[in-house]
Amino acid sequence: MERIWIFMKITEDIIYAGVNDHQVDLFEGQYRVPNGMAYNSYVILDEKTAVMDTVDANFADEWLANVAKALDGRKPDYLIVQHMEPDHSANIENFVKAYPEATVVANTKTFAMMKNFFPKMDLAGKKLEVKDGESLALGKHVLT
């Protein structure tokens, strides 16, 4: 089945860069999803740019193309990893390879899990560990 690439502006500076999976029929291996599912990822364009989450491993090329289109020639400053379920995190290593200057933002537990998921990935000098209640200012957007 042909994959359909999705790209849409949510606001002038928040862009949906996720992908739709019409092949999957079970979410989490147990819940029927007869129309497939979306793997959500967003790009925030501000003084600093942030990519929110990655997508399922089977959609690396489509997702990276969507991110590049959303960035429109800019380089991402941050990859925000909200949690390590594979449909949100499978392409962290691909992102780091594509954008080696970007900083990966996550909490302590998430970084510990990343080591298990991606044992060869080197984040030395490229990670920002956040704690509950901390904020990250991108410009007019502040992530908490």
Please state what every model-predicted region is:
Residues 7-67:
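Conserved beta-strand hairpin/beta-sheet module of binuclear metal-dependent hydrolase folds
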Residues 1-7:
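Short, Lys/Arg-enriched N-terminal segments with co-localized hydrophobic residues
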Residues 58-105:
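Active-site metal-binding motif and surrounding structural segment of the metallo-beta-lactamase
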Residues 26, 91-92, 115-116:
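Short glycine-/acidic-enriched loop or helix-start segments at secondary-structure transitions
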Residues 49-50, 78, 141:
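Structural motif
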Residues 9-12, 106-144:
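Metallo-beta-lactamase
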